[in-house]
Amino acid sequence: YKKNIIIEKPICLKTSQVTELYKLAKKNKVKVFPVFQNRYNKAIQFLKKKKTIDALGKLRIISVQVRWCRPQRYYDLADWRGTFSHDGGALTNQGIHHLDAMRYLCGELKTVNAKMSTLGAKIEVEDSVVANFELKNGALGTLEVTTSARPKDYNATISLVGSKGLAQIGGLALNELQIYSPNQNLCKMNSEKIPTAYGFGHFSFYRDIKKYFSNSTKFPVSFDDCLKTINLLNSFYISDEIKNSVNPTKIKDSKRLGT
C-alpha cells in the first residue's frame, strides 16, 4: 500500500525482521514509527536528564520487576496468543515496556543470563522469566517478569541504585516516580495519575509524528535504537535456549521467537 506505518510493541519479534521492515520502508519511501510510549512518561523523562541521573552517582545496581496476572482465559481469547510465532511470552508482550525503559535509561548490556518457565497457564511461551545481567558500564542488574501472579496485577518497577542515591519508578505503567533520594520532593511533580495501563504517552508520540511531517523534526526512535531493543529482547531468549550467558552484541535471533 506504500503508507507510513505505526507499529505497537514489539515492532517485530526478530532483529532480522526489523532490518527487513526498515529496508522495505526505505525502498517504498515511507516511514516506520515504532511505539515505545512509556519513554514519554514524566518519571522516565525526569530520570533521562543528565543532571538528574548524575545526582545518583555511578550506577551500581538495576532492578526490573513486573508481577502481573494473565490467566488462561486471556490466552484463550485468540489462537495467536501464547505462541512463539505471533506473540512471544511475558517478556515480549508485557515486559518489553520495562526492558526498553531500562535500556533507555541505563544504556547497553554486556552480558545476559536468563531462565524462562511456564508456570501459570497452558501455553507454549514463557509466562515467567528471571535473569541477571551486567551493563557495559559495570553495573549489575536483575530482571523478574511474570504474568503468573494471581489474582491481579501487582507491582511493576524499575529501580536504580547509584553511589550517591536511589531512584525507583513504578505505578501501573511506569507513571510514578516513587523514590528519588537526592530530592524526594521532586517525586510528586514528576508522577502522573493515569486511568489505564496505556497511560498518556501515545499523545506525545502522535505529537512527534506531527512534528516530523510538519517541519521535518527528527523522530526520536531511530532504526538503530529500535533494533537494539529487539536485539536485547532476543538475547534473553537465546540465553534461556543455550542455558548460558550471552553478549547481546554478539548474538543473532532466538530460534523460537517469530518461528
Regions of interest found by a model, annotated:
Residues 119-126, 136-204, 222:
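NAD(P)-dinucleotide binding in Rossmann-like oxidoreductases
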Residues 2, 77-85, 184-191:
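Short glycine/proline- and charge-enriched loop/turn segments
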Residues 38-122, 243:
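Predominantly a Rossmann-like dinucleotide-binding segment in NAD(P)-dependent oxidoreductases
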Residues 18, 43-44, 98-99, 202-207, ...:
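A general structural signal for well-ordered alpha-helical segments in protein cores
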Residues 17-19, 53, 136, 210-259:
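C-terminal helix-rich "cap/oligomerization" subdomain common to oxidoreductases
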Residues 1-39:
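Beta-strand-loop-alpha-helix segment that lines the small-molecule cofactor/substrate pocket
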